[in-house]
Amino acid sequence: MTTPQKVAMQPITVEFPLRGDWTAVHTPAEKVPSHGVDVLGQTYAYDFMKVDWGKDGFIFHDKSTLRFFTVGVSVNDCYGFGEPIYSPVKGEVVMVEDGLKDHRWVHPIKDFLAMLVRSLYMWLSNKPNLHKIIGNYFIVKIDGMEAYAFFAHTKKNSIKVNPGDKVQYGQHVANVGHTGNSSAPHLHFHLMDQPNLLTAHGLPCNFSEYKAFNDGVWVSKRYEMPAKREQICVKEA
């Protein structure tokens, strides 16, 4: 795997890939690389989760905190699980990997240990099975540029496109899942310069339009990157 050189680049503007209220738990608005590593083209990657803003703390499920830290919660009790993903770009699908089962339960300690094992496997293996690491995923080449949109951890058998398919802005392409190296249901999204994950370099992107809840009011945002744990919203078209 190559390590890309970080250089100043203008962000590519795309549409927001989700609808309703979400938050970015990892975002290049906070730091670059956003996930702490320059691998798999994820230098400028986002992780989006759905949480309950009416509860204290960062709560992404409808069970008690005690239950979460003891026995865990079912993936079906997590707010974002199964939510539709919409294409933020116009382009052609170049790769699809689906069929991996979603993790049935979410538990902070067990998930951390499982993610650690999978990460070590990727680093130590000469030919890592990326499907097991990334979960279900697909890649779209954006029309008119050498840029590729990458979507990961999608729900089993929810990807609605195949290699060679043309996708349009706002097209329902998959559903949020909990597959691969995932600690809770979320969408991992980033842009990169080629479809080969092992050699790809990340490309920055921002979003054409969304709203952010700041200081008690909703503020319209255009061509910006959401801040970490900022409440953001995109209404249905």
Identify the residue ranges that each predicted region occupies.
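Short, charged beta-turn/beta-strand-edge "cap" motif at the junction between a beta-strand
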Residues: 98-101, 173-183
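Terminal presequence/propeptide segments associated with secretion/organelle targeting
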Residues: 1-33, 39-41, 233-237
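Acidic, glycine-rich catalytic/binding loops that coordinate metals and/or anionic ligands
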Residues: 23, 33-35, 59, 128-130, ...
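Short, well-structured beta-strand-loop connectors
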Residues: 84-95, 160-176
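Short glycine-rich loop/turn motifs
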Residues: 43-45, 82, 134-138
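Short, small/polar residue-rich loop motifs at catalytic or cofactor-binding pockets
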Residues: 79-81, 133, 159-160
